[in-house]
UniProtKB/Swiss-Prot annotation:
This is Small ribosomal subunit protein uS2. NCBIfam families: rpsB_bact. The lineage of its organism: Bacteria, Pseudomonadati, Pseudomonadota, Alphaproteobacteria, Rhodobacterales. GO terms for biological process: translation. Belongs to the universal ribosomal protein uS2 family. The gene is rpsB. GO terms for molecular function: structural constituent of ribosome. It comes from the Bacteria.
Length: 251
């Protein structure tokens, strides 16, 4: 596998260049704006292309070193593509409301994950002894925890990189990542500030096609990193293919 390729045409067709209404702009994004058309800011894709490419390299390299990536997108149109992209590359996601302390208070979050796993087990195997009301309460608790934590239940610790759609909506996630020194890759639209984002992808963060394109590219970059990691492991294992000869004891 190789780093996923994309073209300027693909970005245009997905509407990546369409920003927000000029009245809603954030001056901190001025350097990434090409101009405006009919009251809408147009993102300078000649900058987006190399910056997206750099972001994909960071994703690939993080996974190649055995790192964990957390995909974050809680707005309605991002929820499904974020979850699908993370699952496709065996990474982790948060696509409902960001839970305060997900990163900075991982110990408490991991206790909630343990509770979710416990509920799964009880409801799958040993629910016979429960009353109808007890079972119903457990199922409700399970559904609530699954919606909040299902995408990070196998993360096993804080991630090594965040990939975010819509930095305005996910400002809490960025603040927590900054506090812990976790790098952030994010799509930043013309109405938001790139502050706190280590690898900015200037572009539309609302159009379904644009979101699907970002998610697909990041997922494929992670898969490329996984392939590189497995290849490296294969080389190490290959050196151990020949079993050491056993010394025979003389009678």
């Amino acid at each position: 596998m190789a780093l996923p390729e994309f073209s300027m045409r693909q970005l245009l067709e997905a509407g990546v260049h369409y920003g927000h209404q000029t009245a809603r702009w954030n001056p901190k994004m001025a350097e990434f704006i090409y101009g405006d058309r009919n009251g809408i800011h147009i993102v300078d894709l000649t900058q987006t292309v190399p910056m997206l490419d750099q972001a994909l390299k960071v994703v690939r390299d993080t996974v190649a070193k055995g790192g964990r990536i957390l995909f974050v997108g809680t707005k309605r149109q991002a929820q499904k593509p974020i979850a699908e992209a993370a699952e496709k590359c065996a990474q982790h996601y948060m696509n409902h409301r960001w839970l305060g302390g997900t990163l900075t208070n991982w110990k408490t979050v991991s206790q909630s994950i343990q509770r979710l796993k416990q509920l799964d087990e009880v409801l799958a195997t040993g629910a016979e002894g429960l009353t109808k009301k007890e079972r119903l309460n457990m199922e409700r608790e399970q559904q609530k925890l699954q919606a909040s934590l299902g995408g990070i239940r196998e993360m096993g610790g804080t991630p090594d990189l965040l990939f975010i759609i819509d930095v305005g909506k996910e400002d809490l996630a960025i603040a927590e990542a900054q506090k812990l020194g976790i790098p952030v890759v994010a799509v930043v639209d013309t109405n938001n500030s790139p502050k706190g984002v280590d690898y900015v992808i200037p572009g539309n963060d609302d159009a379904a096609r644009a979101i699907a394109l970002y998610c697909d590219l990041v997922s494929r970059a992670a898969l490329d990193g996984m392939s590189a990691q497995m290849g490296a492991a294969g080389i190490d294992l290959g050196a151990l293919d020949v079993a050491p000869e056993e010394e025979t004891l003389e009678a």
